[in-house]
């Protein structure tokens, strides 16, 4: 990280150059990381613990795509780190450090970047990692926040996406659909006029501040054959878990829903599509061999995060969600796609 200049701001309320941005607001997030060098070098190093492998994942979030331009900066920062930390949980890994690439359309207000840094500080404290490096720059496009997260897992214990087998039971953590409904609420509050203030607040919180299921990393590492997080919609990510040779028929009534989601569904059955395909849940889908189900459920229970058995993977069937009559539910789209609008 080095010091590029921003356009001069006569009001004095905006950051004057990259050095100020980094050293005043971002460098404190790297305190205690020896390999970060206080964000004064062009590179950083990370020494893995003996007997462990490093795990890497990278997901950017972009204004107008993954968040609203006027979302609170602390919420934007939290979401940027949370969606990456979620990948660590699915791999059975613990977050250690992250790289931040911050592309700004203009020099940020000092109050804005201070709140953004506070959001990162809260998130990294919650997730157990620290900033180790990255870059900042000016872009002609919208605000873009790219994070590469680095985690650690016992050597050979990485949990792949493609390890599931026929007969494995699929578990899902938490509840599904809250974030998609929170997004719909953010766009048009009038759709959810029948919900209470507390119900609306929960849906918005699930959209703005996802909670990566890091407490499940241990049970996943010990007992899962395959796992991934639900980022692009339950149906789409179930198909990813199943792969080309497997499928699963999930009963809609077996999918865990929060009380606000159930209330929204009762008021408007059309939100079912959003629940199944909306994405941004950041819950975990976990394939467990039959002989490990008891141990997995016990271990997951000790984490404090609920998990639910939603079906069994089978050979040569299509992945679908079925209604109470056993009829597959037709969706307008199976999930989120970055290149489909």
Residue spans of the language-model regions?
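Glycine-rich anion-binding loops of enzyme active sites
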Residues: 61, 96-189, 312
């Amino acid at each position: 990280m080095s010091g590029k200049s921003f356009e001069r701001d006569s009001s004095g309320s905006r950051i004057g150059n990259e050095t100020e941005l980094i050293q005043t607001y971002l460098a404190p997030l790297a305190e205690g990381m020896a390999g970060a060098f206080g964000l004064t070098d062009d590179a950083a190093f990370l020494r893995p613990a003996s007997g462990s492998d490093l795990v890497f994942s990278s997901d950017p979030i972009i204004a107008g795509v993954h968040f609203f331009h006027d979302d609170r900066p602390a919420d934007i920062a939290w979401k940027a780190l949370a969606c990456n930390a979620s990948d660590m949980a699915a791999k059975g890994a613990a977050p250690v450090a992250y790289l931040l690439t911050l592309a700004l359309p203009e020099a940020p207000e000092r109050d804005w970047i201070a709140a953004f840094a506070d959001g990162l500080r809260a998130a990294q404290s919650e997730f157990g990692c620290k900033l180790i490096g990255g870059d900042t720059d000016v872009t002609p496009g919208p605000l873009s926040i790219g994070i590469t997260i680095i985690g650690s897992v016992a050597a050979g214990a990485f949990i792949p996406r493609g390890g599931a087998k026929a007969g494995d039971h699929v578990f899902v953590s938490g509840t599904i659909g809250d974030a998609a409904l929170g997004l719909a609420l953010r766009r048009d509050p009038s759709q959810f006029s029948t919900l209470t203030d507390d119900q609306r607040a929960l849906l918005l919180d699930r959209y703005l501040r996802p909670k990566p299921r890091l407490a499940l990393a241990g049970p996943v590492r010990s007992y899962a054959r395959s796992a991934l997080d639900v980022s692009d919609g339950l149906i789409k990510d179930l198909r990813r878990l199943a792969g080309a040779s497997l499928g699963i028929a999930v009963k809609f009534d077996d999918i865990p829903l929060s009380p606000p989601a159930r209330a929204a569904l009762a008021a408007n059955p059309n939100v079912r599509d959003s629940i199944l395909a909306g994405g941004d849940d950041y819950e975990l889908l976990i394939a467990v061999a039959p002989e490990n189900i008891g141990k997995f459920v016990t271990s997951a229970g000790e984490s404090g995060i609920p998990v639910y058995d939603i079906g069994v993977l089978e050979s040569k069937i299509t992945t679908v969600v079925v209604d109470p009559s056993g009829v597959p539910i037709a969706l307008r789209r199976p999930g989120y796609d970055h290149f489909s609008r």
